[in-house]
Amino acid sequence: MDVSSDGNIFLAGHTLSGTQNWDTYTIKLNSNGDLIWEQKVGNPRGFNPQYIHDEAWGIKATNDGGCVTIAGTGDEYNYSQCNGNDCSDTWNAYLIKFDNIGNIDFETTFSSLDLYNYAYDWAGEDIDLTDDGGAVIAIDNGQFGFLKIDGIQTNLIGDINFDSMIDILDVVILVNVVLGLEQNNVSDINQDNMVNILDIVQLINIILNFDI
């Protein structure tokens, strides 16, 4: 589970409801618990979906109003199918990026074949976002490891309303935060663990290209 800066709730898991086998199940709720959207997604490598388990274990809200879900994908049956060196019974970490309204921005898999000349099982167990717009994924590979990736979200310091722009609307929100009229957890522009007039000054300088 994760909660976005504007109070929306994101949940991830896996389900057999309305699917051919276990598929990832991602839900976005508003702060009252009302459903905004839900998505069931699986079988990214295109094998027979009747034999593929897609099991989601982690999720993070992204600054565009969407989220990123991390899972594992593979089969646990006598069935086995291969596309080149990529075989269904070798599990992969499975990442899905959703936008604000639940559409898939992109999905991809990661495996030991990306790094080595031999295959063994990988599954994504959890995910956290990094300040450079990427993410760190916790990998179950029979032991435990971490995978650093890029390109999960655009990191715009000062984009307080998450509209992919830095403008006067962000200044208005920041002023309201300083006055105690609103709450926002990305308002500390200068990263001094306080939100005050200095953050407003720096945000205005960013807009005027005096500070980058």
Segments from the language model and where they lie:
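A sequence-level/structural motif corresponding to short, flexible coil/turn segments enriched
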Residues: 1-155
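Cellulosome-associated attachment modules in secreted, modular CAZymes
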Residues: 151-212
